[in-house]
UniProtKB/Swiss-Prot annotation:
This is Large ribosomal subunit protein bL34. Keywords: Ribonucleoprotein, Ribosomal protein. Belongs to the bacterial ribosomal protein bL34 family. GO terms for biological process: translation. PROSITE patterns: RIBOSOMAL_L34. Residues 12-24, 32-46 have a biased composition (Basic residues). Residues 1-46 are annotated as: Disordered. Transmembrane segments: none annotated. One of its GO terms (molecular function) is structural constituent of ribosome. InterPro entries: Ribosomal_bL34, Ribosomal_bL34_CS. Residues 1-11 have a biased composition (Polar residues). It comes from Stenotrophomonas maltophilia (strain K279a). PANTHER family: LARGE RIBOSOMAL SUBUNIT PROTEIN BL34M, MITOCHONDRIAL RIBOSOMAL PROTEIN 34 FAMILY MEMBER. One of its GO terms (cellular component) is ribosome.
């Protein structure tokens, strides 16, 4: 029996886990966003 690939893409899970609203929910998530803003990232989150 072959092992399943670990990456099974789903846009819903992508947004829920890494989206902007998900980042804003936690203090650490907001830290991530502020770091990415400071770095000058064009895209802040998924």
């Amino acid at each position: 029996m072959a092992t399943k690939r670990t990456y099974q893409p789903s846009n819903l899970k992508r947004k829920r886990d890494h989206g902007f609203r998900a980042r804003m929910k936690t203090a650490d998530g907001r830290k991530i966003l502020s770091r990415r803003r400071a770095k000058g990232r064009k895209v802040l989150s998924a």
